[in-house]
Swiss-Prot record:
Family: Belongs to the NqrB/RnfD family.
The keyword Transport appears for this protein: yes
Organism of origin: Chlamydia trachomatis serovar D (strain ATCC VR-885 / DSM 19411 / UW-3/Cx)
Origin: domain of life: Bacteria
Listed name of the protein: Na(+)-translocating NADH-quinone reductase subunit B
Gene giving rise to this polypeptide: nqrB
GO biological process: respiratory electron transport chain; sodium ion transport; transmembrane transport
GO molecular function annotation: FMN binding; oxidoreductase activity, acting on NAD(P)H, quinone or similar compound as acceptor
């Protein structure tokens, strides 16, 4: 029956007045069945895996990430808009799989989570395919060429890199810009130098920054979430710096001023975690000995919240740590991010129980997709490995240089440099970008050496933007797009090296 419908569509399009619609019939035929057309020029390769099957493997690799996006966005939305501080407290203090699924089943409901997540993700997916597909069809008709299968993956990647609160009209504008300016402008699928999905996101990021960063990570109605958070903080009698918020780990990292030093977060951590020894213990003890002369009987790791704030914000000349009082809340938030406390625990970051763009939250889901892409040979392991190693190395490098240049175990170096290197791999969009964006075969280099250089370049830029640039909390998007621009240069370098070895 399906074959008859496709044949009927071909008959209609072969009529003279509908011949310009032939690309649509060809696209439907190719999607449903094995394409009948053969290459018009060499090489002629007979293979069961054509471009359509190749793209379908990428779609299958995206399935774990899509499920994680639906599940996490639905759960976060229901918890954050509940206006119930008891539910929020229970959610933030989850530890382990057993307590996690017990909380979901007893407090929220699995069906409710999936339904809420689908309400957020599926409309964005539909818009991506509808608007992006329309642009593809129009250009195919105008240029009189076949509709390529590239949108099958681009249309699925695009909504996964958007915040859940993005307005629908804005999502449509972004995918249209990405397809037209990022791909069709260069000649269509296979000739674009930039990743179309990232091009669309970059356009939205620079055109509508307030809708792409800040408090945009929960539910589909930011105003409702803000009201719910304010209600929960009020009912729970939370202070201004320990109230409920929807800040992400990268937002905390980016918004922390340079005046927050390592010694400040170590002082807070020693009281929250009851650590017997922190890296800056000697500096803490020296300063505390002077400060505690007015408070006999106190120890540096057994302070009340008021005493801790007093010690950290007292001027250095009086025995304190010299932090501006207005920055104490930032220091508390960064302490959680650096030491993996509460919602920023390593488990939450790895498995995806965090806030962020729809597809970037779950590192383990991205790794499952990476396994399939590597197993089938679709993605380059060289790009993935060099990207990950480069990001890890430079995160570690900034930490070591901070210690060496300031002394005292980096006590007076900016605290943001001391987030563990492995945690950089689990926060933001690094895992998603590493697996699905940087490995785009069209916009990435082709030579083996070039792939190593390309991945290392992206990893370096990602960490540099995260830690040094105060304007952008995340560096993955810009790093990959810049890597796309430099990809021909990396190929040229690799080609010269290859020729020199052959001579």
């Amino acid at each position: 029956m399906l074959e008859k419908l496709v044949d009927s569509l071909w008959k209609i399009c072969r009529k003279s007045k509908f011949q310009h619609m032939t690309p649509i019939a060809d696209a439907v035929d190719t999607f449903c069945f094995e394409p009948l057309h053969t290459p018009s020029s060499p090489p002629f390769v007979r293979d069961a895996v054509d471009v359509k099957r190749w793209m379908m493997l990428v779609v299958i690799a995206l399935m774990p990430t899509i499920f994680a996006a639906v599940w996490n966005s639905g759960l976060q939305a229901l918890v954050y808009q509940s206006s119930d501080p008891r539910i929020m407290e229970a959610f933030l203090h989850i530890s382990g799989f057993k307590s996690y699924f017990s909380f979901v089943s007893q407090e929220i409901g699995i069906g409710s989570v999936l339904f809420a997540g689908c309400k957020i993700f599926l409309p964005l997916l539909f818009i991506s395919y509808a608007v992006g597909g329309t642009c593809e069809v129009l250009f195919a008709i105008i240029r009189k060429h076949k509709i390529a299968e590239g949108l099958l993956v681009t249309g699925m990647l695009y909504p996964l890199i958007l915040p859940p609160t993005i307005p629908y009209w804005m999502a449509a504008l972004g995918i249209a810009f990405g397809v037209v300016m990022g791909k069709e402008l260069f000649g269509g699928t296979g000739m674009n130098i930039l990743n179309p999905a990232l091009t669309g996101r970059a356009f939205l990021f620079f055109t509508f920054p307030a809708k792409m960063s800040g408090d945009v990570w929960v539910g589909s109605n930011p105003s409702r979430i803000k009201e719910s958070l304010a209600t929960m903080s009020s009912l729970a009698e939370k202070s201004h710096f320990d109230g409920f918020s929807q800040s992400t780990c990268l937002q905390v990292l980016n918004s922390t001023p340079p005046s927050v030093k390592r010694v400040h977060i170590d002082a807070i951590a020693s009281n929250i975690l009851n650590l017997e020894h922190v890296p800056t213990q000697d500096v803490l003890q020296t300063q505390f000995a002077t400060w505690a002369e007015s408070y006999p009987g106190l120890t540096v790791d057994q302070l009340s919240l008021e005493q801790l704030q007093n010690f950290v914000t007292t001027p250095i000349t009086e025995g304190g740590l010299g932090l501006l009082p207005a920055h104490f809340d930032s220091a508390c938030s960064l302490t959680e991010a650096v030491y993996g406390i509460g919602k920023f625990s390593t488990g939450n970051l790895f498995f995806g129980n965090i806030l962020g763009s729809l597809g970037e939250t779950s590192t383990v889901a991205c790794l499952l997709g990476a396994g399939l892409l590597l197993l089938t040979g679709i993605a380059s392991w060289r790009t993935m490995l060099s990207f990950g190693l480069s990001a890890f190395f430079f995160a570690w490098f900034f930490k070591i240089m901070s210690i060496l240049t300031t002394g005292n175990a980096g006590a007076w170096a900016p605290a943001k440099f001391f987030i563990p290197a492995y945690r950089h791999l689990c926060i933001g969009g690094l895992a998603f970008g590493l697996v699905f964006m940087a490995t785009d075969p069209v916009s990435s280099p082709a030579m083996k050496l070039a792939k190593w250089l390309y991945g290392a370049f992206i990893g370096f830029l990602t960490i540099l933007i995260r830690l040094i640039n105060p304007a952008y909390p995340e560096g993955v998007m810009l790093a990959i797009l810049l890597g796309n621009v430099f990809a021909p240069l990396f190929d040229n370098i690799a080609l010269k090296q290859y020729r020199q070895r052959r001579i």
